[in-house]
Amino acid sequence: MTRTIHRLWKRKNSAYFGKGLVFNKYTGARGKSGSNDANAEYVARLRNIMDTADVSFQTAELGKVDEGGGGTIAYILANYDMNVIDSGVPVLNMHAPWEIISKVDLYEAFRGYIAFLKEA
C-alpha cells in the first residue's frame, strides 16, 4: 500500500488513483536507517515484466525524511541479499477505519503480481 497525496509531500512523488500498481523503489527513514534501495537492474527487470504484460504501474515515495511516512519490512529481506521493492495500490486514509482504493488499481496489481510470478 502507498498513501495518495499528502499535504507535506511533493505531488510528483505521490501515488494517484487510476494509474495502476505502485512501486516504491526506496524505503526507509532518517537517511539510511532501516532503508532499502532496489538496484537499477532489478527495477528495469520489473518494468520490462509489467510492460510486456501491459500492466499499468507508477512509482511513488512512502514519505519524506523527518515528516512521517510509511513503514515496510523490505530492509529485513534485503539484509539477506534479496532484490526487494515494495509494491501495492494507492490508499486514501491508510490505517483508518475506512480506507479507499481504486478498483482499477487493485485489478492492475492483481495482473502485475500474476505477470511477476510467471516471468520472474
Where are these regions (language model features)?
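Active-site-adjacent substrate-binding region
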Residues: 4-98
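Acidic, glycine-rich loop-and-beta core segments that form the ion-binding/anion-interacting portion
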Residues: 1
